[in-house]
Amino acid sequence: MALTQSLKLSNGVMMPVLGFGMWKLQDGNEAETATMWAIKSGYRHIDTAAIYKNEESAGRAIASCGVPREELFVTTKLWNSDQGYESTLSAFEKSIKKLGLEYVDLYLIHWPGKDKFIDTWKAFEKLYADKKVRAIGVSNFHEHHIEELLKHCKVAPMVNQIELHPLLNQKALCEYCKSKNIAVTAWSPLGQGHLVEDARLKAIGGKYGKTAAQVMLRWEIQAGVITIPKSGNEARIKENGNIFDFELTAEDIQVIDGMNAGHRYGPDPEVFMNDF
């Protein structure tokens, strides 16, 4: 069964709320096989990036999976060193060639960077106008980055992909994005695996016959957040997709919300944005 529950972006494009994240999947057999498992398990949203160096693997899986292209939602991202107007256009062409696609569904600026994201966004707007991408967005942008972008853009970002999990619930940023009609996607939605044995999450899962991982993904989706768990394990990929047959209660959500500690497993965009 296709996992097609979707969220409508500000431009009307439908984006599946569950995606398959490809971070850290080795290019070649590992990434291609895992992506194929995900698609066969019903995933219709694939999330890769230039820096992951596995766009070609994603492309091979997409080409051979038997699912029509228009039924898949493919995201890739521009790396920091390619920011700037002309270099963005060039980098996009490299990505789309590696993917073997005529268009991507969502293209993201991976990190804010130092001082080029305005010019970079103008290139994104051109790609969008030229229908090479169906939606454009950002990743790891804080409120002040988005405010700066909104001062200069013709087309507002449709998505902001950020680190988000129970120890970093990003409530304020999520509320801000919602106020600007920007959808939020969670990367590292399971806290890079550190939270799958958490007793609080396991106790909640026990009520539904679900794992802590499934509870976290369900919590994100019920909060209106798109989530992209990564795994190279076929059983885990299937498990992560099996989250649409139960619903967390308000009390469950209160417990998970209460776990927030402002703890990042990934870099802080305020620091990493200068690291090219």
Swiss-Prot record:
Oligomeric and partner information: Monomer.
UniProt lineage: Eukaryota, Discoba, Euglenozoa, Kinetoplastea, Metakinetoplastina
Activity profile over pH: Optimum pH is 6-9.
GO BP terms, alphabetized: D-arabinose catabolic process; prostaglandin biosynthetic process
EC main group: oxidoreductase
Transmembrane feature ranges: none
EC number from the UniProt entry: 1.1.1.-
Pfam families: Aldo_ket_red (PF00248)
UniProt keyword list: Cytoplasm, Fatty acid biosynthesis, Fatty acid metabolism, Lipid biosynthesis, Lipid metabolism, NADP, Nucleotide-binding, Oxidoreductase, Prostaglandin biosynthesis, Prostaglandin metabolism
Protein's name in the database: 9,11-endoperoxide prostaglandin H2 reductase
